[in-house]
Amino acid sequence: MASQGTKRSYEQMETDGERQNATEIRASVGKMIDGIGRFYIQMCTELKLSDYEGRLIQNSLTIERMVLSAFDERRNRYLEEHPSAGKDPKKTGGPIYRRVGGKWIRELILYDKEEIRRIWRQANNGDDATRGLTHMMIWHSNLNDATYQRTRALVRTGMDPRMCSLMQGSTLPRRSGAAGAAVKGVGTMVMELIRMIKRGINDRNFWRGENGRKTRSAYERMCNILKGKFQTAAQRAMMDQVRESRNPGNAEIEDLIFSARSALILRGSVAHKSCLPACVYGPAVSSGYDFEKEGYSLVGIDPFKLLQNSQVYSLIRPNENPAHKSQLVWMACHSAAFEDLRLLSFIRGTKVSPRGKLSTRGVQIASNENMDTMESSTLELRSRYWAIRTRSGGNTNQQRASAGQISVQPTFSVQRNLPFDKSTVMAAFTGNTEGRTSDMRAEIIRMMENAKPEEVSFRGRGVFELSDEKATNPIVPSFDMSNEGSYFFGDNAEEYDN
């Protein structure tokens, strides 16, 4: 494991703070949550939503999206300069669902972006509160990760759909800053870099001139972010090669795909944060809870405690199973789309099933869906235990894994062995060890060959009772190893479409 001493903690990145102590970090994160909560309360007042309507996750998503859109400066500028028919660049909106005469109806609302920005700043003591915005982006990203399998995106960049466990954060906007970069998986970074290199191959001017200089520094920055996720010297050396290339092309794409594959066994460190929908923070704030005073952490017990005491509702389509919808949202809340399902079942206290076995579609409702048949139900977001989120990949281990997803990216710091299908992963590494990265490739392959199935990750770490706030008594779970460990198992999840 690379020494973590030099890195600022993710909370520090999120709080622009130089070195802060734990109490300051907790207060600072709490302040961010307070701001989101106050904003949400104000929006519910503006829209005259009932308490039930305000706790509807679909309304929460619309309100979150409106404020993200209002602060998306690059897109706003683009819309001003390229006006499209019937779209007002100064306005933002979306569907709001109301309960009228025993039925759910959809109402499309439209607000001035300026007005939304005013309400947001007012809720955040006059600040732009970018961290609160990033927090909502990560929540949306985690929801996408649990809902969709990015098969098409993987195939388009020349990767393999079975590498989906590396794709955390693949739908995060570019403007999501350091906190966003921290939660991106190795595959996501590789995909962004490959897209960039491909543009350079197709467009002669991509790396040239004034713009080219900016492009180049963005490229090198992304390479460094990816390098920082790897935990072995050979993988890092390979990233140096890719970064220093004079004219990035197919050789670099090859190296990147190689390093992504290697991350299925030699996992990178990817941060995990429990980011909850705004409709959870709002009611907590309005009930008088002071997050800044009490302190809050995205990686400890706090989100679990908050969800134990929250009522969140969701619209349910006619043939959907509310329990399955709950599982989807629960996984999103804990950033756990790529975690081992056996561990998730243990923590949640109810069986967590693979995506393909769930009778539920995404949380968002499309504008052409019929509202007459919509019901709503309570989402069950409580857990039996809690566990500390990890930002390491755990050490490596092999286990029989499934046909769809062939590795996991751990979310919780809990002792277990990490499943991956070694024979499948290794089959991808035949032959190609020539070229300028040959020694690194050989070294990486050797390390992967030596990964042992009986090794345990996160040794001594366990889950905790919800009454054990100080994490004093770790409970090390025991697993039925015959059970299926992968979420996207031979899967039929919908594709993510922008």
UniProtKB/Swiss-Prot annotation:
- The gene is NP
* Family according to the record: Belongs to the influenza viruses nucleoprotein family.
The name this protein goes by in its record: Nucleoprotein
What Pfam families would the database entry show?
Flu_NP
The record places the motif (Unconventional nuclear localization signal) at 1-18
The protein's superkingdom reads Viruses
Q: What is the scientific name of the source organism?
A: Influenza A virus (strain A/Swine/Dandong/9/1983 H3N2)
Task: Tell me the compartments it is located in.
Answer: Virion; Host nucleus
Q: GO CC terms for this protein?
A: helical viral capsid; host cell; host cell nucleus; ribonucleoprotein complex; viral nucleocapsid
Assembly information from the UniProt record: Homomultimerizes to form the nucleocapsid. May bind host exportin-1/XPO1. Binds to viral genomic RNA. Protein-RNA contacts are mediated by a combination of electrostatic interactions between positively charged residues and the phosphate backbone and planar interactions between aromatic side chains and bases.
Which residues fall in a compositionally biased region of kind Basic and acidic residues? 8-21
Its chief place of residence is: virion
Q: Name one GO biological process term.
A: symbiont entry into host cell
Provide this UniProt record's keywords sorted from A to Z: Capsid protein, Helical capsid protein, Host nucleus, Host-virus interaction, Ribonucleoprotein, RNA-binding, Viral nucleoprotein, Viral penetration into host nucleus, Virion, Virus entry into host cell
- InterPro entries, per this entry? Flu_NP
